[in-house]
Regions:
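Short beta-strand-to-turn element immediately C-terminal to the catalytic PLP-Schiff-base lysine
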Residues: 17-19, 139-142
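Beta-strand initiation motifs
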Residues: 22-27, 146-151
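Short acidic/polar active-site loop segments enriched in Thr and Asp
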Residues: 10, 71, 289
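Helical "lid/coupling" subdomains associated with nucleotide-phosphate turnover
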Residues: 2, 16-19, 35, 39-68, ...
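Short amphipathic
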Residues: 29-32
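N-terminal basic/disordered segments at the start of proteins
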Residues: 2-24
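A generic, well-ordered mixed alpha/beta core segment in the N-terminal half of proteins
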Residues: 117, 125-140
Length: 341
């Protein structure tokens, strides 16, 4: 059994799983919206309260992993930690729990997510978009004979939290000018990335697959899914027309009304519009009329890679996680993980 913790810009997640033959066999997942990246785009700093929220959540995850009988644990951080000058403060707090926190580059995040997604698509050529809070990772390629082929991989600084903080008011209905600016920002970054020779010269993707809370929320909202059912959402598609309709609905509602929509987590309401704009622009630019959502995301890729390293096999991506024996992890909050003010 292996445990992996992914600390994202919006959400902190834990997966505890058995992995064999490069596939995740059994898994339990936990998720908590902590909004680590709030304000980072403007200040370049992690908010102290956000750091504490993440710390308390991770402490509970370490305890849960121990109770599940896990032998080793991996802890990674993504966009918000990459951007923040005070990310070491969070790193020290996590280290006090006995973890080895690793800030992974965007390109590695993209490759790990692709690895997680690809197990459901055989050898097909797919474009995977991991649209998170601070960034969107794009990876185009396939898996053939257990070898990952990725001719195109990019990490773009555009995500639901970044777009919201930069262009959209969290408490009010956005103006048409703000919406247009958000669309233009996302569109330009996507167009620049997809205009590169690596993408243009690669075999065209058969399918567009999206991971992350925005993608899964769009599927759930479109079906008015209550309660959330990952089995229903996984590998289900949504049309570009339905994404546009959901964006138009969200843009007309204040945050407190968005939070009441069936299929949407209340804590995700402040950033869902920004995330929807990002994915709509991606569909527009790539020309895909349908986007498939996947629950097999970065966590799956982390699990597969961690299992390979634990078993002494080569990592399937050009990166090795640091597996911390779980008996070295403390579990439960340390008495003084933060400096006194």
């Amino acid at each position: 059994m292996i445990a992996v913790i992914d600390i994202g810009t919006v959400t902190v997640r834990l997966a505890v799983a058995e992995v064999a033959g490069g596939r995740v066999l059994r898994m339990a997942k936990y998720s908590e919206i902590c909004n680590l990246g709030v304000g980072v785009d403007a200040t370049g700093l992690l908010d102290t309260d956000a750091i504490k929220r993440v710390y308390m959540t991770v402490a509970s995850y370490v305890e849960a992993a121990k109770e599940a009988g896990t032998q080793a644990i991996v802890c990674t951080l993504t966009s918000a930690a990459r951007d923040a000058k005070n990310a070491p403060d969070l790193g020290m707090a996590l280290a006090s729990l006995g973890l080895e926190p690793m800030i992974i580059p965007g390109e590695i995040e993209a490759a790990l997510t692709f690895l997680g997604v690809a197990q459901d698509f055989g050898g097909r050529q797919i474009l995977v978009a991991d649209s998170g809070g601070g960034s969107t990772e794009l990876a185009l390629g396939n898996v053939t004979n257990n070898i990952i082929n990725l001719p195109f991989i990019r990490s773009l600084d555009v995500g639901c939290r970044r777009v919201t903080d930069r262009f959209l008011s969290e408490g009010d209905i956005p103006t048409s000018a703000h919406l247009e600016a958000a669309h233009a920002f996302a569109s330009q970054l996507m167009r620049d990335a997809l205009a590169t020779s690596e993408y243009q010269e690669a075999i065209r993707p058969e399918v567009l697959v999206a991971t992350g809370g925005t993608a899964t929320s769009l599927i759930a909202m479109n079906a008015q899914l209550e309660p959330y059912d990952p089995a229903f959402v996984h590998l289900r598609g949504i049309s570009v027309e339905d994404v546009q309709k959901l964006e138009e609905l969200l843009a007309k509602l204040p945050v407190e009304e968005r939070a009441k929509l069936p299929g949407l987590q209340e804590k995700r309401a402040p950033v869902i519009l920004g995330g929807t704009i990002v994915l709509f622009e991606l569909m527009q630019i790539t020309g895909f009329t349908t986007m498939i959502a996947s629950e097999s995301d970065l966590l799956f890729g982390l699990l597969i890679t961690s299992a390979a390293v634990q078993e002494g096999r080569p990592s399937p991506v050009v990166w090795k996680p640091i597996l911390k024996p779980l008996d070295k992890a403390l579990g439960g909050p340390s008495k003084k993980p933060f400096k006194e003010k």
